A protein has these predicted regions:
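Non-catalytic substrate/cofactor recognition surfaces at enzyme active-site rims
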Residues: 1-326
């Protein structure tokens, strides 16, 4: 999408400093393609991004931000956390590491103390619906927003994904349906709402310092090995997947094995591209990466690009108490 370009355009329209502008990506497996990914190039099920949609999408990012700045009003902020249980977990193992904490920031108008906005950070792939869904959906976060806005009419909900590269609802779902997305999303909404209702007037602050900072970091590139090794890995993954299906294994292990096949297929493409010398130019476009931190009072929003595993976020939050990772 060109985050640097958006930041320049947004600064020109609003005057905000670049380090105070965060563009947070949502995540769904039930929406239009918005990027070109090397590992998908041979996948017949993944279409190219639609230029007309992308033009509207990019314009919408700018206009949404400009509207937020232009309608700013005096407010007070409270920060809390909710404990989430039953929405999802580690996607590789039912008892694997995951993060139960939901970071919650509530903004209310000073004039009448009515809720204005709620920002939440939750580490979980919103993938109740799978890639075979033909309807555009934000998956279970939609139903989380519904619960919150029904309880607080007029509320604007900002839903941020935390690091969830190895997290999903797969061991908690009963099916890949909208009803199931509603069940999990509403559960999360009620858990957040419970935390919000525990807040009192003393928890809201008006005298908060707001600041931001950015830096660049060089990431070591992953090497994909030989094409032969990647193809062997793919064969093994397919054999495991087919065996689990034959044995009638539960949904969680079968879906994990299926996603392992997807990953192995992509590794073959990437190994071929690396062998052909195609990956260096692409890596140069994305490296170094930009890291960002936003401070609102004593709360830090650490903003990381990509789809990090949850262990990185847990380690960071242990080192920086009170921080949330987006």
């Amino acid at each position: 999408l060109g985050v640097d370009r958006f930041t320049r355009l947004f600064r020109a329209r609003t005057g905000l400093a670049p380090e105070r502008i965060m563009i947070s990506a949502t995540h769904t497996h039930s929406g239009p393609v918005t990027s070109s990914i090397l590992s998908w190039r041979d996948d017949p099920t993944v279409p190219k991004a639609d230029p007309e949609y992308m033009a509207a999408f990019k314009a919408g990012i700018i206009e949404a931000g400009v509207e937020a700045v232009s309608t700013a009003q005096p407010a007070a902020v409270a920060v809390t956390t909710a404990h989430s249980e039953g929405v999802g977990g580690n996607r590789l193992a039912a008892d694997g590491t995951h993060d139960h904490e939901v970071g919650v920031m509530v903004v209310r108008r000073r004039a009448d103390r009515q809720p204005l906005a709620l920002q939440m950070v939750y580490s979980m792939h919103p993938t109740v619906l799978h890639e075979d869904s033909r309807l555009v959906s934000s998956d279970f976060p939609h139903y989380t927003r519904e619960v919150l806005t029904a309880a607080m009419p007029g509320l604007q909900v900002l839903y941020h994904n935390g690091p969830s590269g190895n997290l999903s609802p797969r061991y908690h779902v009963k099916g890949q349906t909208f009803a199931e997305a509603e069940r999990l999303g509403a559960l999360l909404g009620r858990q957040v709402l419970e935390a919000v209702r525990r807040l009192g007037d003393a928890d809201f602050r008006e005298d908060l310092t707001v600041d931001g900072a950015t830096c660049r970091a060089e990431l070591p590139p992953r090497r994909f090995g030989s094409v032969a090794a990647a193809e062997a890995e793919l064969r093994e993954a397919k054999e495991t997947y087919e065996r689990l299906k034959r044995e009638g294994a539960p949904h969680g292990p079968v879906r994990t094995a299926e996603c392992t096949v997807f990953g192995a297929e992509e590794r073959v493409v990437l190994a071929q591209a690396e062998q052909a010398g195609e990956t260096a130019a692409i890596l140069a476009e994305y490296n170094p990466i930009e890291l960002q931190a936003l401070r609102i009072g004593s709360t830090i929003l650490a903003c990381w690009p990509g789809e990090c595993f949850v262990e990185y976020a847990l380690q960071f939050k242990q080192a920086v108490p009170g921080a949330f990772v987006v």
